[in-house]
Amino acid sequence: MTWDHVNGTSVEAACDESGSDGENLTRGNTDVFAHASVVLPMESAAGHIREIRDRIRSPAEEYKANHLLREKHRAVLEWLLSVSGPLYGQAHVHLVEKAFFLVDRTADLLLDDPGTALSLYRSRRATFSAEEWREFLTAANRLLWIRVDEAAGEPVEAFFHHIDRLRRAYSGTPAADLLERFTQGRERAHSYRAAILGGRAPLIPVLNPLPSSILRTAAHWSGGGRPVRLAHDRQNMLTPERIAWIEDTARRRGIGLTGLRLVVAGSDARVQLADFLAGIARRFASDELNGRGDPALTALLRPYTGESAVWGDEGSRARLGAVAEPDNVGTGPAGCSTEVNSAF
């Protein structure tokens, strides 16, 4: 399906993700979440999948990004992302640095000011030890995670105990001043946890990057006023209620999303291409984040990352060609999910 300026037919972008660990942002398998989308006719996408198979010559029945990431298939990978490849100008990927996403969501919950997150995140290395920072992230993850296997106040008190310890240890530093601001949100934190324990958890989990990434994807493809539909690989968290929330939020924010449907990746070649791109982008972005990026491969990815990402690390952000922005999906004081804010 393509955009028709005469009759207003929607473009349909096929989507998939890589790096999802649900709400577990500190002890999962990956440090980056990537959400990729592809706009191609089904027939063309199927032809590209066949060509990838022919170039790789692997006996595998199902191809994943890992096949393309093997060094022996580097030429195929470079072709796929190149200007002359099948995805150039027809695909997009939204990147999320999980640690920054977590700090951003914590600042939004406690302060209604996600801008504080970027300042704290960028001061971390000059202030805290690696272990202290990991402990802070773990406490924040526990605070925001929607689960009811512990008393409402326990994650709150554990988080603020850690905040107080860091403030005392680094008194007088800019980071300590930022942490002081977090203490203003204790009542909000208690309300949030009490709502979860009382069966009033937010419809959209605060720590799951998928819903906001879908909205970002829709915003990208609906730029210029064209309507867009999304065909997404099946995900357990994309219930009918959450899909309705995504569609309603998009309408209220002026994003031209006309619908979101779930498909089986194995039956949609476009989604398979999106799966390739998501896995490739996640690996390249993680490599850059951890100081082991390949400049040539990162340069090939850069045209697909667009101008925004939920990304706090300055060096890797610049190399990936993304502009750091807050995630924009928050919760109210009682843990009720709010709409995407004005950054959209």
Protein language model annotation of sequence segments:
Residues 1-344:
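Phosphate-ester processing/binding pockets and catalytic centers
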